């Protein structure tokens, strides 16, 4: 499923796995929750408890891919790699 379809379906949570300094330097998506990649394991229950699709994104899509694979390996099926910040921002702006 394309990211546009996931976003149009609604009922999702955007999770930005970049470091806080990256958000300050590069910008952020207002509705996104910032949980750096290094904190995901400690905050697993918090993320697991979110209803709907969890869309991870980062600067380029690499860390969000790791986050997506981690949660899939933990048994979650409602996770999606949203890719890089700039690309996701463009998609959101054009919906």
Stretch-by-stretch model annotation:
Residues 2-12, 17-54, 64-95:
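Rhodanese-like catalytic fold shared by cysteine-dependent sulfurtransferases
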Residues 57-58:
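Short, surface-exposed ligand- or partner-binding patches at beta-edge/loop junctions that are enriched
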Residues 61:
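Conserved G/P- and acidic residue-centered "switch" motifs that form tight phosphate/ATP-binding loops
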């Amino acid at each position: 499923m394309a990211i546009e379809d996931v976003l149009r379906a609604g009922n999702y949570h955007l999770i930005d796995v970049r470091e806080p300094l990256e958000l300050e330097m590069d910008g952020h998506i207002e509705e996104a929750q910032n949980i750096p990649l290094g904190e995901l394991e400690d905050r697993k229950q918090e993320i697991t408890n979110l209803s709907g699709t969890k869309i991870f994104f980062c600067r380029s899509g690499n860390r969000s891919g790791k986050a997506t694979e981690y949660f899939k390996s933990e048994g979650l099926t409602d996770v999606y790699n949203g890719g890089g910040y700039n690309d996701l921002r463009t998609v959101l702006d054009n919906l």
